[in-house]
């Protein structure tokens, strides 16, 4: 159902960018309501909205990853231009619907319901499903560059899955992180900043990804000592 929703060709009937984003946003919010009702009646999982533990402060160094594309702009100096259009605010609301729908499905439901004992195995499998889902971008455009999307979404999915388990299934954390990542790296960067991408763009992406991977490995070593979600 979710694949149908995401791949549905709204653009065949809706030519206005504003109304296209509006239709996709409404469709995702309807899907969120459906998932919440389905979970309520089936009693699959409990979804904690927000709580805080002192160990959550160790997640703060992961925040710089949110700005990964903007580090590239620091190298460009004055080589970019900010442009706003009428779709700006609807894109923000759309990214909220993306974060809610994808985190509810892939983390709260799929990752929670996987019948796997080890926490890291559940994170890995849910991240793989999350990455394969993003192959829809390739099948909708048949652009070879879109084949790289599942690679970075696997890394993002693993990070979100780790944060989800570390924070004891804090839904607000993963939704907030996912929303800000998309807002900063897609809306503000891709849609608002007219920049070209040269080799420095990819060098920057690799460096930021390497930092995130190293810090996650560090947290993995700590996890069995300070976090009960990983003590199995």
Task: Give a label for each model feature.
Residues 5-15, 70-81, 134-140, 187-194:
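Juxtamembrane "helix-exit" motif on the non-cytosolic side of transmembrane helices
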Residues 40-47, 217-232:
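Membrane-interface capping segments at transmembrane-helix boundaries
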Residues 101-127, 162-170:
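Membrane-interface helix/loop boundary segments of multi-pass membrane proteins
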């Amino acid at each position: 159902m979710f694949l149908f929703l995401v791949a549905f060709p709204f653009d065949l009937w809706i030519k206005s960018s504003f109304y296209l984003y509006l239709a996709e946003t409404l469709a995702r919010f309807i899907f969120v309501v459906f998932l919440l009702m389905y979970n309520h009646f089936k009693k699959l999982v409990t979804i904690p909205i927000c709580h805080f533990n002192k160990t959550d402060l160790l997640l703060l160094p992961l925040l710089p990853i949110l700005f990964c594309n903007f580090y590239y702009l620091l190298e460009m100096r004055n080589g970019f231009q900010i442009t706003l259009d009428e779709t700006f605010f609807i894109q923000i609301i759309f990214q909220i619907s993306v974060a809610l729908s994808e985190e509810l499905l892939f983390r709260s439901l799929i990752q929670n319901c996987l019948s796997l004992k080890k926490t890291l195995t559940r994170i890995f499998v849910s991240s793989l499903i999350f990455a394969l889902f993003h192959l829809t971008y390739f099948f909708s455009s048949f652009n070879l560059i879109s084949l790289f999307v599942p690679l970075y979404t696997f890394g993002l999915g693993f990070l979100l899955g780790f944060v989800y388990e570390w924070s004891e299934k804090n839904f607000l954390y993963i939704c907030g992180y996912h929303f800000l990542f998309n807002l900063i790296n897609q809306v503000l960067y891709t849609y608002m900043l007219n920049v070209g991408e040269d080799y420095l763009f990819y060098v920057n992406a690799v460096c930021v990804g390497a930092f995130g991977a190293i810090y996650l490995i560090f947290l993995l070593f700590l996890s069995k000592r300070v976090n009960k979600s990983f003590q199995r």
